[in-house]
Regions:
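Extracytoplasmic/secreted envelope proteins and their assembly/folding machinery
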Residues: 40, 256, 264, 268-271, ...
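Short, conserved micro-motifs composed of acidic
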Residues: 1-153, 157, 179, 192-194, ...
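Conserved beta-strand positions that form and line the central face of beta-propeller blades
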Residues: 42-45, 98, 251, 258, ...
Length: 355
């Protein structure tokens, strides 16, 4: 019997149960880097000599719920019981743990399903003689890692859905990165974002021959709700020599060229873009609003552009691929007639100087 589980795709995306002379076993199939599936093999972390079935991998991609027959090898309340395991940081799995009474009974339980927020679970039980569906509030210890659904629609400059594109999700203070494909028919995408550690998240568009563009989502924006990225928040623009593109969310302290931690987080994504596109040469441009002395603004913009260049070099981008220049207040994107517009003019751009 096949049990499809597609949530993340990095760890486990398909589990099956098969019946042989001895009972049921759970099998695992891992997704290869090219998107194809590996051969299903027994998932011996959970399999016993008895019946093991009904696997459910939560959207956190780390917590697996399943059912096992209670035996001396795997004691429980009775009959078929619900268990769970978690994947550890080193890739190993914890020891199976019984979800406990009164969820498990002396009869059989099957098919546990946990809501995306990890708070409510549903399952079938034959307690009392007939199969019925029950729900309960999942206790803290058995809950998966907190996650949220990040979704949006990606369209090009003409308003048409984008095909052959990928959304990259990165976490501040972590090397963990996930990728989801954009639906080429309608431009929609959806990604599971882990929110347990309360980290800011950077969402980046990746499409061959197109510019780097990202959106920073503050950890406070998640909470218990899903997050929708509006179409205008992410641009999909072709790389053109001489064209300028803004790197969003590059922030500095007032009158300072010192990069903030959030700015460094964004620039790590930009560095990945440059390393992946090793033939591109870019010029880093610093811009200010019109508040303050002209010469001081020019010097500040030069220092900020240089600090961006130096940080990119520290991340492994070759220095001979980068130049930096400041323009002060001389090249506003919009009129400096409101605080909102002045904020738009305090920006860092990159210009394609060669490909």
């Amino acid at each position: 019997k096949s049990v499809p589980l597609y949530y993340d795709g990095r760890i486990i995306t398909g589990l099956t149960t098969t019946t042989d002379f001895f009972g049921n076993d759970i099998y695992i199939s891992k997704r290869r880097e090219d998107g194809t599936w590996g051969t299903a093999v027994p998932f011996d972390v959970v399999n016993t000599a008895g019946k093991d079935k009904s696997p459910f991998l939560h959207q956190d991609s780390e917590t697996l719920y399943f059912v096992s027959q209670c035996t001396k090898e795997r004691p429980g309340v009775g009959g078929l019981d619900i268990f769970y395991i978690r994947q550890q940081k080193d890739g190993s799995w914890s020891e199976p743990k019984n979800i406990g009474y009164p969820i498990n009974s002396e009869s059989d339980e099957l098919g546990l399903f946990v809501s995306i927020d990890g708070e409510v679970a549903y399952f079938s039980s034959r307690v009392g003689g007939d199969w019925n569906i029950f729900s309960f509030e999942l206790y803290e210890e058995a809950r998966p890692q907190s996650v949220a659904l990040l979704k949006g629609v990606l369209k090009d400059e003409n308003g048409s859905p984008v095909s052959n594109a990928t959304i990259e999700v990165a976490y501040e203070g972590s090397d963990e990165i996930t990728h989801v494909k954009v639906n080429g028919d309608d431009g929609k995408y959806a990604a599971i974002v882990k929110t347990e550690k309360k980290q800011d998240v950077m969402v980046t568009v990746k499409k061959e021959g197109h510019a780097f563009d990202s959106k920073l989502i503050a950890k406070e924006d998640f909470g218990k709700k899903d997050v929708t990225i509006r179409g205008k928040d992410l641009d999909v623009k072709k790389l053109v020599v001489g064209e300028a593109y803004t790197i969003n969310d590059i922030l500095y302290a007032t009158s300072s060229a010192v990069l903030s931690d959030k700015s460094k987080f964004i620039l790590k994504g930009f560095a990945r873009f440059l390393i992946e596109n090793e033939t591109i040469k870019v010029g880093i441009q610093g811009h200010t609003d019109d508040v303050g002395d002209d010469n001081r603004n020019l010097k500040l913009s030069e220092d900020r552009a240089l600090s961006v260049k130096q940080y990119l070099v520290s991340l492994g981008v070759e220095a001979n691929r980068l130049t930096s220049k400041g323009f002060g207040e001389t090249m506003p994107n919009v009129p400096n007639d409101s605080e909102q517009n002045r904020a738009k003019n305090r920006r860092t751009d990159f210009v394609i100087e060669g490909m």
